[in-house]
Amino acid sequence: MDNIKLTIAYDGSNYHGYQLQENAVTVQEKLEKALNTVYYPYKITPYSASRTDSGVHAKGQVANFFAPKQIPIHKIPLALNTNLPNDIAIINAEVVGSNFRARRDAIKKEYRYYVYHAPYMDPFWRNYALHYREQNLDYTKLQQAANDFIGKHDFSPFRAIQGSNPSIDPVKEIYEFDIDVNAGEDGNLIIFKVIGNAFLYKMVRILVGTLLQIGNGKLEINAVKKALQTGDRLFVGPTASPQGLVLQQIWYP
């Protein structure tokens, strides 16, 4: 049996997240169906690095699975893509060591969040960015406050309470948090790029929601510092909508 690592991209618009759910269509369901078609009669179960939420996208999701050596590794992407819907694609497949686990062995992840900042919404971005109409957005404050997230902190106030696992350690480390403004062909995109060792449930979307409220003056410039110091959610903004979020990349040793 080979342990095979997949890199997966998907448009999450039509899915209730990555992880299997009863009575809901998920990315994992489609992936398992394709795997079990390709490797029939074997039952194949993929193990993913990240469980993205409903409506969230990925360019660099990673999963691993164990399968018999019946398909050459270079043919696996085409074999799976032939059996996947056109909003899910296998980008790469490689054989890894038998001890590799996509979730456990990840050392850092990059998420990107896209905001379309204009009075109107470009129809081509409606499923891939948050539409932000308010014009009084201070870009300097956005980056200044984003810098306060960098480092190792207890991010408890920046995770969704409902649906989260309280046993997960809330101490995470953010390595980089960069914001590109006036991006895109028309200059209306704001791209939040955050890299960390791991993230709590809906954490990235809450970080972005907080920064937007700092940028428009609804929260003070030191709100991030106060939230991290006190754990008080009074200094935290709303959860940004899911369609702007992309799991960009995952690193391994």
From Swiss-Prot:
Keyword Chaperone tagged: no
Listed InterPro entries: PsdUridine_synth_cat_dom_sf (IPR020103), PsdUridine_synth_TruA (IPR001406), PsdUridine_synth_TruA_a/b_dom (IPR020097), PsdUridine_synth_TruA_C (IPR020095), TruA/RsuA/RluB/E/F_N (IPR020094)
GO function term, MF aspect, one: tRNA pseudouridine(38-40) synthase activity
Reactions this protein catalyses: uridine(38/39/40) in tRNA = pseudouridine(38/39/40) in tRNA
Pfam families in the cross-refs: PseudoU_synth_1
Protein residues bound to substrate: 111
CDD domains, alphabetized: PseudoU_synth_EcTruA
Record's keyword terms, sorted: Isomerase, tRNA processing
Subunit and interaction comment: Homodimer.
Function in brief: Formation of pseudouridine at positions 38, 39 and 40 in the anticodon stem and loop of transfer RNAs.
Protein name listed in UniProt: tRNA pseudouridine synthase A
The organism of origin for this protein: Natranaerobius thermophilus (strain ATCC BAA-1301 / DSM 18059 / JW/NM-WN-LF)
